Amino acid sequence: MDNWEDPNFELRNLRVIDLKKILHESGVSFPVNARKIEYIRMVDRIRKNKLSSGPQHLLSHLQKEENSNTSKASSSEDEIAPKYLYPSSPSKSTKKPHNETEPLLSPQFIDKPSNIETPVKIESPHVSQNNTFQSYSELSPNVETSLTMKTPPAHASTPKFRSHKSHRVAVPMSFMDSSALHTSPAFSERLKLLSSSNNFSPQLRSPKISHRLQTSATSSPLQHKRPFTNVPERVSRDIEFAPLDSARPSESSSPYSEVDSAEEDDELFQNYVLQQTRKESKLWSFIKKVFHDIKYANYRLLHNLRAFPGISAISSSYLVHIFMILLGVVAAIFLALLREKMFTAGFCDSGASGSSASILGISFPSLCRTCPPNAICPSPNYVECKPGYVLYEPWYSSLGFWPSKYCVSDTSREESVNIFREECLSVLRSWNAILHCSNNSSDLLERNMSYNAHPYVADNLNISSDHISFPSKPFALGLLHDTLLERKSPTLGLEMFEDLFKASLAVLSETNEVVMDSKLICYDSWAGIPLRCRLKQQLIKFVWRNKVFLFGILALSGVIFKLINFFRTRSIVAKYLPSASRFCVESLKRQKANYQMSRSQEPVIPLIEMHDILFHGNGPLEQIHMTKATARTLWEAIVERVEQVGSVRTRESEVDGEWTRVWEWVGTNTLDFQTDRSFINTTSPLRE
C-alpha cells in the first residue's frame, strides 16, 4: 500500500478499506457505498495528478496577463503559481476564447513549486443512461469532486535508488517563436527572463505527447526542427528534461562552427533512423532498402542546403516528389525500350535470333519470349493454340509484356467430348448385356459382321492391333459410329459430330474397362448387366477358367473319403467280428440242445433270422452306431467266419413254407437244458 504512487503499481490489488484510507489521507470526499472501481478511479486520478504536477498552465496565465493588460510584471513566480498550477474544470475551459485555449507554449515545459496546497478537481467518469450497472454517483453528469492536497517535495516520493535531484525544470524559451506573440512590455520581459534562466532541452518519454514548438525568426532552424535523439523504451505520460549536449551549436554561430563533420553525419543518421522507426514502411524488403538510402541521401542534402540563404525555405517533401517523378519517368522510358526490344526479338521457339540487346547502357543476354504452353508459335509474334485449346488474351495484352497471350482449355468442347464418351459407354453396356444374357443376340452379331467388309478406321488412334487380345466378342467401330449418328441432335453439324466422335474415341482408349484398336472395340465390364445373369456368367466363367484345379480337388477329396471310410470300416470289423461270430456259434448250440430236449423245434437257424437277432433283436450289435455299408461289411465277415467252423453246416431248408439258407450245429453238444436255460438268462458278453 505504501508504494501506491508508483505508476506501475496495480491499484486493483488494494482492498476497499485501503482505497478509502488513501482518499481520506488525501483529503478527498468520497461516497461511502460506492463500488471498488470508483475508488480505484479516484485514487488513480490522485496518482496521475501527483505524477504530472508541474508547470502546466504558465502560458495560460501569461496570456491572461496580456489580455487584461495588467502591470504586475514584478510579481514573483511563487505568488502566481497557485493560480495556474492545476487545471480548472472542463466545463469552464470550453468557454475560453481562442487565444487562451490554444497556447503557443506547451504547459508541460513550465516549472512548478514543490510544496503548494492547491485544489485538484476530479472529473466524473463518462456515464450512460442505458447502463444499469453504474452507481448513483455515475448517473450525475455535472458532479465534480473538489479536494485540497499538498504536493510533497521531490525527495519525499523518490525511491531510494533514484537521485533526489528534481529533473523538472523550466523549458528554454528559445524553443518558442516570440515574434508570433503580440505582447505587452511586461509579458516580453517575462519571456526574456525565462529564456535567459534556462539552458535545457526536453527529452520525451513518449513521442505521442510531444508538442510542436513554433519557430522564431531569429533562432536557428536546427534548434526547433531537430528531432530528439533519445527515446527510452518505457512510455510514460510525464515529460523529463535533460541538459543539452555540449557539442550542440549555439543560435548565433553556424551549424558547422563547433561540431565536427563526422560527428554531425553520425547525429544526422541517428535522427533519420528515429524518424523511420516512427513511420515504418510496408514495402518489400528490397524496395524498402532502396528507398531507405534515397530518403537518407535527400535528408542529408536538405540539411546541408539549409546553410545557404533562400534554399532552406524549400520543403523537403517537394524535393522527394520531384525525385520520385524523375525516377518514374526513367522507369517508364526503360520499360518502353524493353517492350520494343522484346517485340523485335519475338518468340524463342519461332527461330528468332537470341542475340543480346542493350537498353540505356544495360546489356541483356536475350530478350526473346518463351512460347506459351499448349501453343504453337510459327512466327515471331503469332500464337496458335493446339487442338482442344483456345487463345486467351488478358486485359494487359495491349501492353505487350509477357505473358500477353496464352492458350487455355476449351471447356465447352471438353463438355461435349464427355457427353460423347458417356453415350459410347452406354451403347457398349447395352450391347454387352444383350450378348451375355439375351437369347436374341443373333441380330446384333449379324449387324456387327456386316461392317467387316467396310470397317471404320480411327486415324487419330496410334494403337497397334497386333498385341491386343479381346476378352469377349468385339464390336466394329463403324457400328458404334452409325448408332451414335442415328441419335445425333439435328442442331449438331456433321463435321462437329465427326470431330467429337474422334475425340471421344481418344478418351475411350484411356479407359480401363474398354479394349480397342483402330477398327474394333470391346467393353470388358459387368456394368449394365442384371444381377442374376451376372452371377451365372461369372460362375460359368470361373468354373471353366479353373476346371483343372477344381477337378483335381474333387478327385483328391473322393480318394481321401474312400480311404477314411475303408479304414473306419476295417477298424469296426476288427473290433466286433470275434464276439459276433462267437455269439452265432453259441446260438446254434442252444438251438441244437433245445431241439434234442423237446423234439418240437427245428435244429437250424435261418441266416436272415440270425442277422435280425444280431443287429436288431436285442443282439450284441444293436447299440452300435454304424452305417449300412459298414453293417453289411461286418455281416459278410461274420458269415464268412461262421461258415469256416467245421461243426456248422450250411444248407437250404424250408422254413415256414419258404426255402432259405440255414445254419445247423452238427458237432458234439455239451450243453443240456439247464445250462442252456442259464445261458439264455445270462447277459451276453457282447453287451458288456
Swiss-Prot record:
Xref: InterPro entries: HeH/LEM_domain, Heh2/Src1, Man1/Src1-like_C, MAN1_winged_helix_dom
List, alphabetically, the Gene3D superfamilies matched.
MAN1, winged-helix domain
Keywords, in A-Z order: Meiosis, Membrane, Nucleus, Phosphoprotein, Transmembrane, Transmembrane helix
Topology versus the membrane, per the UniProt entry? Multi-pass membrane protein
Mind naming one GO cellular-component term on file for this protein? mitotic spindle pole body
GO molecular function terms here?
A: centromere-nuclear envelope anchor activity; centromeric DNA binding; chromatin binding; double-stranded DNA binding; heterochromatin-nuclear membrane anchor activity
Q: Which intervals carry biased composition (Polar residues)?
A: 212-222
Positions where Phosphoserine occurs in the chain: 684
Does the keyword Transmembrane helix feature in the UniProt annotation?
yes
Transmembrane annotation, as ranges: 318-338, 547-567
Per UniProt, the ranges with Low complexity bias are 82-92
Q: What is the reported phenotype of gene knockout?
A: Modest growth deficit. Suppresses slow growth rates of spores and severe nuclear envelope (NE) morphology defects of vps4 mutants.
Picking any one GO biological process from the record gives: subnuclear spatial organization of silent mating-type cassette heterochromatin
One Pfam family cited in the UniProt record for this chain: MSC
Phosphothreonine PTM sites in chain numbering:
683
Disordered: annotated segments: 62-113, 202-227
Instruction: Give the UniProt subcellular location, in the record's own words.
Output: Nucleus inner membrane
Its biological purpose? Nucleus inner membrane protein involved in meiosis. Plays a role in regulating nuclear envelope (NE) morphology and nuclear integrity, particularly during spindle pole body (SPB) extrusion or insertion through the NE, and perhaps during karyokinesis.
What is the protein name given in its UniProt record?
Answer: Lap-Emerin-Man domain protein 2
Q: Tell me what organism the protein belongs to.
A: Schizosaccharomyces pombe (strain 972 / ATCC 24843) (Fission yeast)
